[in-house]
Regions:
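A charged, aromatic-enriched C-terminal amphipathic alpha-helix characteristic of glycosyltransferases
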Residues: 78-81, 341, 345-371
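Conserved donor-binding/catalytic core segment of Leloir-type glycosyltransferases
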Residues: 199-217, 223-229, 234-237
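Nucleotide-activated donor-binding/catalytic signature segment of Leloir-type glycosyltransferases, i.e.
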Residues: 245-270
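Short hydrophobic beta-strand element within catalytic cores of glycosyltransferases
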Residues: 301-305, 314
Length: 372
């Protein structure tokens, strides 16, 4: 049993260690909101120019970078693993350390008396449920090394995850996955949405995709569907560091009804959200994603695939349109054709009612309780 000193959360010196600020993603934005709620510091492998500028977003705490920016995925994992193991001695200075994403090897550098919290977005998918997908992309001569390293990293992860005082999962889906792979128990704490940033303004003539251009998000299939619907317009918002960017650009070449836009979070983004017909998201077994909740906050329904955490957040036929788990591009087309501007408008009241359950104020209250 470990007994923590009875400090108020404001008195506890707290830091969040997040693996990388590489993208303008929902994981990165969650850490920013969490840090503001706790008035704490942030450490990361690196802070990329392609991610949020935390100072511009109002973050005033200390920022600690333990490595340097690197894009090549396999090398990045190895370099960051070394940095988290050997360059995080500063964690000893904190009363509470919150770990986010793939950085928990640094737990060995925390003070024995500190409170260690793991906010689990998912067990590393390249080590577990999507391991075979990653393996397919690796040249044959590298596969033996990948198998050896991934085996070692899995053993490390399963040993390290047992050292936490508190484990939080971002959804029931993540709770199940973490328990399945590690047998560890956790408590569910849904990420928040800043509801005041989203509102219904108007409805224009386009559907919206707001996802990283990567294999796991399956944006290529959304593009394929809209290539067959030249009368329907698609706007894709992406990040400059997205790994599948060039491939998807080439796929959409000469399609006048598909537009790609990259923009900082606080510039133009909400304008595109407010004026869309609906959002389209078909990721692979997603753990938690703010996309559908933010969409509902803007009174916009979602087209989603019948897998992952989404069943926890939206109501079929009232706040979303569902495509089958074993879907084809034709199912995306059918969903878009069904979700006309008129049908989307009829869903807007239920959308905003459901989004209220994911408010920032509720998240702020709960995360402060866990830090005590």
């Amino acid at each position: 049993m470990k007994i923590f000193n009875s400090l108020d959360w404001k008195q506890r010196k707290t830091i969040i260690l997040h693996d990388t600020f590489l993208y303008k993603g929902w994981g990165e934005r969650l850490i920013l909101m969490m840090a503001k709620a706790l008035d704490c510091d942030i450490a990361s492998g690196f802070f990329s120019r392609g991610s949020f500028n935390l100072r511009d977003e109002g973050f005033q705490g200390k920022m600690i970078e333990v490595s340097s920016e690197v894009f090549k995925k396999g090398y990045r994992h190895l370099k960051l693993k070394q940095a988290f193991l050997f360059k995080t001695k500063f964690l000893q200075d904190y009363d509470t350390v919150i770990f986010s994403w793939d950085c928990i090897s640094a737990i060995r550098n925390c003070s024995p008396d500190s409170k260690k919290i793991y906010y689990c977005h998912t067990p590393p998918r390249y080590l577990y449920d999507l391991r075979d997908e990653y393996l397919k992309k690796i040249p044959s001569y590298i596969k033996p090394a990948f198998n050896l390293v991934s085996w070692a990293f899995r053993k490390m992860y399963e040993k390290e995850v047992k050292k936490f005082d508190v484990i939080l999962s971002n959804s029931i889906n993540t709770w199940k996955r973490l328990h399945h792979f590690t047998w560890e128990e956790s408590q569910v704490l849904y990420p928040p949405v800043e509801l005041d940033k989203f509102q219904w303004i108007d409805q224009w003539d386009y559907y919206l995709s707001v996802s990283r251009l990567s294999t796991a998000k399956r944006i290529d299939n959304i593009v394929k569907a809209f290539k067959q619907m030249p009368d329907k317009k698609l706007v894709v918002i992406y990040g400059i560091n997205d790994p599948q960017k060039e491939e998807i650009f080439e796929l959409a070449k000469d399609c006048k009804n598909i537009e790609f836009i990259t923009c900082p979070w606080n510039e133009w983004f909400t304008d595109y959200v407010w004026k869309s017909i609906a959002w389209i998201c078909i990721p692979i077994d997603e753990d938690f994603w703010m996309v559908p909740v933010e969409s509902m906050s803007a009174w916009k329904p979602v087209i989603w695939v019948d897998e992952g955490w989404i069943k926890e957040s939206v109501i079929n036929g009232e706040t979303w349109v569902l495509i089958p788990e074993w879907w084809a591009v034709e199912d995306i087309i059918k969903a878009v054709e069904y979700l006309t501007p008129q049908v989307a408008l009829s869903m807007k009241t239920r959308c905003i009612e459901r989004a209220q359950d994911f408010s920032y104020s509720e998240f702020e209250k709960k995360i402060r309780e866990f830090v005590k």
